[in-house]
Amino acid sequence: MSESVIQGSNPDRVLSPTSSKSVTQTVNGSHQFVIQGYSLAKGMGIGKHIASDNFSVGGYQWGIFFYPDGKNPEDNSSYVSVFIALASEGTEVRALFELALVDQSGKGKHKVHSHFERSLDGGPYTLKYRGSMWGYKRFFRRSILETSDYLKDDCLIINCTVGVVVSEILCPQLHSVHVPDSELGSHFGVLLDSMEGSDITFNIAGEKFLAHKLVLAARSPFFKSKFFSEFEANNTEVTINDLEPKVFKALLQFMYKDSLPEDVEPATAHTFERLKLSEIYETLIVKVLAAADKYDLIRLRLLCESHICKGVSVKSVAKILALADRYNAKELKGVCLKFTAENLAAVLETDAYQQMKDECVTLQSELLKAVAGHEEGSNSTGGAKSQSVWAQLSDGGGDTTSRHVRQRTT
């Protein structure tokens, strides 16, 4: 005798609950419509409009229609009309709208009709076909408009915002595939360390470095033009006399691994305050900065600038400004000029500034401009202290252009 057992449902088994969430929101976009020559547009006729260029919001095309003589006969005598029109074929769209006539006096008193940030009893407006519109037949009384700050130099400006309603169901992502970080740098790093397949040798002060032409050409426009030119393409050895081996090694580190070498000096304010400018020029990071500028390695130059920027202080900024100017470090130079302008009185008292003033005469005029821009941006009221600082900067620079800069007074 045999017995068969049919497995049924297990009432004691509890399944894990599932969940989902419906999210409805708007995808917003804006368009500005400038109407130049309003007085010439008047009289074009009832129901005739000036249309903006089409613009895209939420995957649909839209347009703004301005009716200088009104959209309907009953509105012609008193009002201009403004509408937003659906310019896409096909499906119906639910959306929120805002129309704003810009106050051109600068007072910010715009004439705004908006669905946003207020409760709508009937929900968003539905446009069902191309050419369907939302707007106002009586948008603005014409007689008031023509004597208002909304009309300036015969020009009107209308800002339009459209918020297309979209819904989606969000479910927990139970499964995923992990993608590790890019290994490109590490793979090229292995290539640098092994130099397998190298096809170019660099002789740097008697020390030999192997490399790959394609890697260097991809990283540096200088090397690309060097290796792919008609006269240099077949060269397998290059001698460079104006670089130290450790600097060229740093260039290779960057071109293969996209990073600075680990033996670059820490950049601290104390380091740059302690060293003389001539000693700063001999540091590895500054030599790498100079080489990056020469060999058109823009990202390496920015890495160096970012590293050196950590050392900016009242006592060091003049030195760093001088080296930034010397090696075309524009971002670093901008930081130094801004820092100096913000801390002008203290910087002018430092020995480093006095040395920079004598050795980098052309920087004086740039510093004057930076200070002027800073004071204008902060709405400075001047005062005796501010004026004395200006006098010290203007008269003590040694720059013939700065001697003619007139001191600003308030």
UniProtKB/Swiss-Prot annotation:
One Gene Ontology CC term in the entry: nucleus
User: Where is the BTB domain positioned along the sequence?
Assistant: 198-264
Task: Provide the function of this protein.
Answer: May act as a substrate-specific adapter of an E3 ubiquitin-protein ligase complex (CUL3-RBX1-BTB) which mediates the ubiquitination and subsequent proteasomal degradation of target proteins.
Could you tell me which species this protein originates from? Arabidopsis thaliana (Mouse-ear cress)
| Pfam families according to UniProt | BACK_BPM_SPOP (PF24570), BTB (PF00651), MATH_2 (PF22486)
The record describes its quaternary structure and partners as: Heterodimer with BPM1 and BPM3. Interacts with RAP2-4. Binds to MYB56 at the promoter of FLOWERING LOCUS T (FT).
The MATH domain sits at 28-162
From the Swiss-Prot or TrEMBL record, give the protein name: BTB/POZ and MATH domain-containing protein 5
Tissue-wise expression = Ubiquitous.
The portions of this protein that span the membrane are none
Q: Which InterPro entries match?
A: BACK_BPM_SPOP, BPM1-6, BPM_C, BTB/POZ_dom, MATH/TRAF_dom, SKP1/BTB/POZ_sf, TRAF-like
Pathway of action = Protein modification; protein ubiquitination
List, alphabetically, the PANTHER family matched. Answer: BTB/POZ AND MATH DOMAIN-CONTAINING PROTEIN 1, BTB_POZ AND MATH DOMAIN-CONTAINING PROTEIN 5-RELATED
* Free-text comment on this protein's domains from its UniProt entry: The BTB/POZ domain mediates the interaction with some component of ubiquitin ligase complexes.
